[in-house]
Amino acid sequence: MTINYTTNLSLAEPVTGTESGTWGDDVNKGLTDYLDISIAGTLALTSASFTANALTLANTTGSSSGNGITTTTAQYYIIKCSSLSTNVTITAPSSSKTYVVVNLDPTYTVTIKASGQTGITIPVSSKAL
């Protein structure tokens, strides 16, 4: 079974002539589910989602056995933060991915950045693209 993955979103690319009997699952769980969350999916985060006020997102991949989407999957388009107990930082992969970050918290800020960068801070009750 041979599946390649795209560079930016880690979408499944089954190799021609492989995946006999599982190709549909590979596409549905490795491509369709990811396209859905990368175009219109919302990742809802609260203070419980963060460890030491930080969260690192990572590209995940799907296969015939499951889509691999988790609460730290980087492919989501919208990230909503609420019920925070302190200012938080989200670190996303360094790629050409766009996020809409919505800070619904009335007290604390949300910073989103790539590893090694300072990032941008979304003020309380604000959103940024």
Q: Which residue stretches match the model-derived regions?
A:
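Exposed extracellular interaction/assembly regions and N-terminal maturation sites
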Residues: 2-11, 15-110
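Surface-exposed loop/edge segments in extracytoplasmic proteins
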Residues: 117-121
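C-terminal beta-strand-rich structural cap/linker in extracellular carbohydrate-active enzymes
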Residues: 122-129
